[in-house]
């Protein structure tokens, strides 16, 4: 009940502040906490800052680098506990619901309903943006997580095709390793280990197994022979990374592929933003393909608005929400970011072949039931459960634990996190 009362109050405040802004009585202000700090990401968020300023807004940037957003969430928690929440925060998936349940999110339904968001968003994505019937977040994009990126020149020089099975990937990696090329650019950070892990789960087990294991947390799936095979593949892939991988940021791993130091990287399509920002072209300088297997893992970036005082800040929330879902921003931002628009009515004519493939695959997997939320990127589970899985995954990746031992540890960790 507390959440509902706060949301209703914030909705009235945002409506009033929007009217005051329209009448020129207030200047919209927004302090925006986000973790878009790499080259391609910074270029993308600059688009939103420019649009906000062009509409009379005053933007205070609060970027927090590191940890795939973990550091940003730590900073957010400290701000909320001190009673000084930012105006808007980059949040996604169940984390939005968790903050809503704490009664600290603002209701942006007035903006959403005035702009017909329900008709513009895929049902699955709209569901992530709503909290008990109210709109509490604005989606920016749809990222595909299960991508494999490659240096086109390296593959051509070694007569290697983009792998379509994990066996083909392993064979290519061993061939590259034999001639002194790092097969897999990887950063030894827990979230990056988890990113690779979930693509292997989807690839070896299929969407139904992925759903059972990493969404439903079914104990039989978690300790199955299929999960043992997943960890066997992770152990094999550990041998394909270089000795200096520990602690490397993801964009530095992308740079290894760009610069010809490594052949492949497994990473979401924000990596494409790095290639593009460096002036590289898909199909010419780098190659993109879904990781081996069927299905699609999605990650949706979004902004949630927090309860704040002051008409200027509330007007800033209304303006920011409207701009985030605006067709111009959705097009320009996603071209820079490497993702595809959350809105279904934005033309993809100007997008590259990788984005076209992503959009086509999202449509087909949505129809056949193999469109899956990314656990590693906060779309499938609450933090305690996803953290428990990731701890086990990274412990296995950085040790000599057997796969059989690891799956039991995985099941136990999830049980203890409940």
Where do the protein language model's features map onto the residues?
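Hinge/lid segment of periplasmic solute-binding proteins
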Residues: 94-146, 170, 196-198
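Glycine-centered hinge/linker elements that transmit conformational signals in sensory
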Residues: 173-176, 215-246
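Conserved N-terminal structural module of periplasmic/extracytoplasmic solute-binding proteins
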Residues: 9, 22-98, 102-104, 114-116, ...
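Mature extracytoplasmic/periplasmic domains
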Residues: 39, 105, 110, 259, ...
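Extracytoplasmic/periplasmic substrate-recognition and gating elements
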Residues: 50, 54-55, 82, 158, ...
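Extracytoplasmic/periplasmic solute-binding protein
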Residues: 134-140, 146, 170-219, 262
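C-terminal capping/gating helix-and-loop segments adjacent to ligand/active sites or protein-protein/ligand interfaces
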Residues: 139, 297, 342-346, 359-418
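Extracytoplasmic/periplasmic substrate-binding proteins
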Residues: 35, 196, 232-312
């Amino acid at each position: 009940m507390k959440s509902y009362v706060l949301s209703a109050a914030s909705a009235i405040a945002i409506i009033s502040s929007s009217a005051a802004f329209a009448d020129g009585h207030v200047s919209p202000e927004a302090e925006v906490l986000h973790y878009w700090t790499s080259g391609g990401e910074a270029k993308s968020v600059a688009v939103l800052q420019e649009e906000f300023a062009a509409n009379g807004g005053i933007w205070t940037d609060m970027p927090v680098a590191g940890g795939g957003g973990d550091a940003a969430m730590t900073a957010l928690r400290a701000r909320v506990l001190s009673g000084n929440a930012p105006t808007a925060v980059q949040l996604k998936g169940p984390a939005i619901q968790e903050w809503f349940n704490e009664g600290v999110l603002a209701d942006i339904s007035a903006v959403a309903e005035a702009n017909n968001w329900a008709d513009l968003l895929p049902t699955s994505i709209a569901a992530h943006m709503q909290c008990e019937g109210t709109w509490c977040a604005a989606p920016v994009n749809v990222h595909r997580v299960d991508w494999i990126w490659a240096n086109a020149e390296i593959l051509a020089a070694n007569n290697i095709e983009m792998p379509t099975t994990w066996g083909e990937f392993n064979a290519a990696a061993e061939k590259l390793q034999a001639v002194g090329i790092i097969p897999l650019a990887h950063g030894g950070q827990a979230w990056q280990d988890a990113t690779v892990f979930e693509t292997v789960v989807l690839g070896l087990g299929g969407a139904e197994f992925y759903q059972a294991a990493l969404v439903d947390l079914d104990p039989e799936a978690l300790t199955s022979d299929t999960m043992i095979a997943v960890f066997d593949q992770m152990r094999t892939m550990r041998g394909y990374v270089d000795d200096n991988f520990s602690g490397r940021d993801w964009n530095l791993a992308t740079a290894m592929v760009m610069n010809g130091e490594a052949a492949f990287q497994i990473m979401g399509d924000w990596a494409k933003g790095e290639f593009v920002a460096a002036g590289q072209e898909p199909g010419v300088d780098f190659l993109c393909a879904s990781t081996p297997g069927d299905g699609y893992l999605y990650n949706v970036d979004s902004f949630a608005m927090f309860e704040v005082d002051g008409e200027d800040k509330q007007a800033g929330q209304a303006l920011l929400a409207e701009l985030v879902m605006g067709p111009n921003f959705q097009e320009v931002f996603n071209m820079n970011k490497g993702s595809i628009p959350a809105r279904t009515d934005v033309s993809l004519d100007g997008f590259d072949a990788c984005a076209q493939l992503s959009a086509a695959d999202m449509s087909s997997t949505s129809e056949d039931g193999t469109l899956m939320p990314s656990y590693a990127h906060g779309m499938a589970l609450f933090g305690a459960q996803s953290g428990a899985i990731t701890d086990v995954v990274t412990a296995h990746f950085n040790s000599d634990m057997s796969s059989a031992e690891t799956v039991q540890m995985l099941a136990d960790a999830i049980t203890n996190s409940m």
